[in-house]
Amino acid sequence: MKRFPLFLLFTLLTLSTVPAQADIIDDTIGNIQQAINDAYNPDRGRDYEDSRDDGWQREVSDDRRRQYDDRRRQFEDRRRQLDDRQRQLDQERRQLEDEERRMEDEYGR
């Protein structure tokens, strides 16, 4: 009875390590192929790496540009809001001054 759970555990461990071993072997083969390709074509492999770096830099640059544009839009929106508020305040001040002038005229001062 104790042998069956032990056998089952051993089988599960064996089955789970096979894919891991296959991944390790596959990665090793890929690294060897890349090393051979780099040995025969050293410039071509470097161009691939550089193009990947350029793509990453473009992506980062695009993200930064979008962030800059978004922040710039926020500043412009805020500036418009402040300008609108200032116009409202100026209008209220003119109305107040007009009312004050009418009051002064009404009381003859």
Curated annotation (Swiss-Prot):
Quote the biased-composition stretches of kind Basic and acidic residues, using this chain's numbering: 41-109
| Region of interest called Disordered, as start-end residue ranges on this chain | 39-109
Supply the InterPro entries for this chain.
Answer: YjdP-like
Identify the keywords attached in UniProt to this record, alphabetized. Signal
Instruction: State the source organism's domain of life.
Output: Bacteria
Q: Which residues form the signal peptide?
A: 1-22
Identify this protein by name. Uncharacterized protein YjdP
